[in-house]
């Protein structure tokens, strides 16, 4: 019997199919989820279930649905979906949801992302631990049924999802500028299912790359955070003379960009761009004191840009639960992470890489309408202000001791500022900074460095790693 404690993570359920996650386990998790949400006020009548393109997803989703209906709730089966399409369904139908996906993990994996009605995330401290424990009891002793089981009905949400997203972004600039050529790498993931419908009717020529749905990922991992997985897109953008490249991860909730030169665009720069646009939209609606959330690993250009556009930047720890919690507390219009998760107040505070992509297209259309021959690289130059290292992992035996050593080295220096919001962040007088934080699951320290230029980044990385890896 699978060990549920091994597959129920902080924010989702994820494991190797067969060994850790099988149909009886999915059925027990469905029953436990139904029991949890039945206690909500108001109690939902159904649970929305969506799935990605992995070979194991149809059977696991069907078993989960069987567990839900066995507890008297209906299931709304939306079929193949991106994770943000599941959030759209949860929000518009005001129902809890379950998305079967393992995102960018290898083909052997699958998982479940859960939310309550209105796309409110379910994590360990908000119901996932309860689901884990109850599902474990069901696996031990059987799942009790109810006299009147629920039913399954199917619903197509793709067209409504596309229409809703396009309604959140002013895309009229695309019609006022020459047709854009955009290469889209779906990585054989769900972007291949959603992009054609979302982009339909826009003044954009899409060059599709790996749109065939294939959960075995025959071309590359569906994880654009790894630079190796952007290489094909970068080459194709240059070969096509394209204006822009977009890359989606497996469940298409994250979107990365490549500019007209084939260079990767920093997610921090996209955060700054979208923040400026969402602030302008909020101000046009008469709002004041508008907040934007960013985690502490994003570039310091983000709070600078937020301030320049009349907003209030709020800094959080790394992790989507902190972003969503802070968005709820502040009423923030937008939130961004260095990992290319982008959260929108008008999208139930949930993340949507597709919505960020539409903002980027609209901004480029406006840029080109204002200046013939304008490019993404030119557009993003104002948002990508500093050099960054990316995340560098080091295996260490004693994480706390190494962090203390770093504090001892840098803390006494004149003009140095330290903070411990998440790990240790050290800000130097010249404006450079680094964050060192421990992994929660592995004996790793994660280092992120930002400075004025690449040479300064390399020098600071070398200085920190000389202590961390000594």
Regions found by a protein language model. Name each.
Residues 42-52, 76, 181-183, 290-296, ...:
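Short glycine-rich phosphate-binding loop at a beta-alpha junction
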Residues 39, 43-110, 166, 197-258:
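N-terminal small/polar loop signature for handling phosphorylated ligands or for N-terminal nucleophile
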Residues 1-64, 70-71, 151-180:
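An N-terminal, well-structured beta->alpha segment
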Residues 110-240:
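Gly/Ser/Thr-enriched, mixed-charge loops and adjacent short helices
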Residues 284-470:
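Phosphate-binding and adjacent anionic-ligand microenvironments
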Residues 78, 129-163, 167, 260-338, ...:
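Proline/glycine-rich low-complexity loops and linkers
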Residues 203, 208-210, 263-282, 353-362:
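Gly/Ser/Thr-rich active-site loops/lids in small-molecule metabolic enzymes
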Residues 97-109, 114, 237-259, 263-264, ...:
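Glycine-rich phosphate-binding loop
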């Amino acid at each position: 019997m699978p060990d549920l404690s091994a597959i129920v993570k902080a924010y989702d359920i994820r494991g190797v199919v067969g060994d850790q996650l099988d149909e009886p386990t999915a059925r027990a998790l469905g029953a436990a989820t139904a029991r949890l949400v039945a206690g909500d006020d108001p109690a939902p009548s159904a649970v929305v279930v969506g799935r990605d393109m992995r070979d194991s997803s149809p059977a696991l989703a069907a078993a989960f649905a069987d567990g839900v209906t066995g507890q008297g709730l209906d299931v709304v089966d939306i079929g193949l979906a991106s994770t943000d399409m599941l959030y759209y369904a949860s929000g518009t139908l005001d129902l809890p949801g379950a998305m079967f996906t393992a995102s960018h993990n290898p083909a052997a994996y699958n998982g479940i992302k859960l939310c309550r009605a209105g796309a409110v995330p379910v994590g360990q401290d908000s119901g996932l631990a309860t689901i884990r424990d109850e599902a474990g009891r069901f696996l031990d002793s059987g799942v009790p049924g109810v006299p009147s089981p629920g039913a399954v009905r199917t619903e197509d949400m793709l067209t409504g999802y596309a229409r809703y997203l396009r309604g959140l972004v002013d895309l009229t600039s695309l019609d006022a500028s020459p047709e854009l050529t955009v290469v889209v790498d779906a990585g054989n993931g769900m972007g291949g299912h959603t992009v054609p419908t979302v982009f339909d009717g826009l003044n954009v020529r899409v060059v599709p790359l790996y749109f065939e749905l294939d959960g075995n990922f025959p071309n590359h991992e569906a994880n654009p955070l790894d630079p190796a997985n952007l290489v094909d897109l970068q080459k194709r953008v240059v070969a096509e003379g394209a204006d822009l490249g977009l890359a989606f991860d497996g469940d298409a909730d994250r979107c990365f960009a490549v500019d007209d030169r084939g260079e990767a665009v920093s997610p921090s720069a996209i955060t700054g761009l979208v923040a400026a646009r969402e602030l302008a939209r909020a101000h046009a609606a008469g709002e004041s004191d508008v907040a934007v959330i960013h985690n502490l690993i994003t570039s310091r250009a983000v709070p600078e840009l937020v301030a320049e556009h009349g907003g209030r930047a709020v800094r959080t720890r790394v992790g989507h639960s902190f972003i969503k919690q802070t968005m709820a507390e502040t009423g923030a219009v937008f939130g961004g992470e260095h990992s290319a998760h982008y959260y929108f107040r008008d999208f139930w505070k949930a993340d949507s890489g597709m919505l960020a992509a539409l903002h980027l297209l609209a901004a480029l259309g406006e840029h080109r309408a204002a200046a013939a021959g304008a490019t993404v690289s030119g557009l993003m130059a104002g948002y990508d202000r500093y050099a960054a290292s990316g995340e560098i992992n080091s295996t260490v035996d004693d994480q706390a001791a190494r962090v203390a050593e770093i504090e001892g080295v840098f803390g006494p220096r004149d003009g140095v500022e330290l903070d411990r919001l998440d790990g240790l962040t050290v800000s130097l007088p010249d404006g450079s900074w680094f964050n060192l934080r421990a992994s929660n699951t592995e004996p790793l320290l994660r280092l992120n460095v930002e400075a004025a230029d690449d040479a300064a980044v390399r020098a600071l990385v070398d200085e920190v790693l000389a202590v961390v890896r000594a």
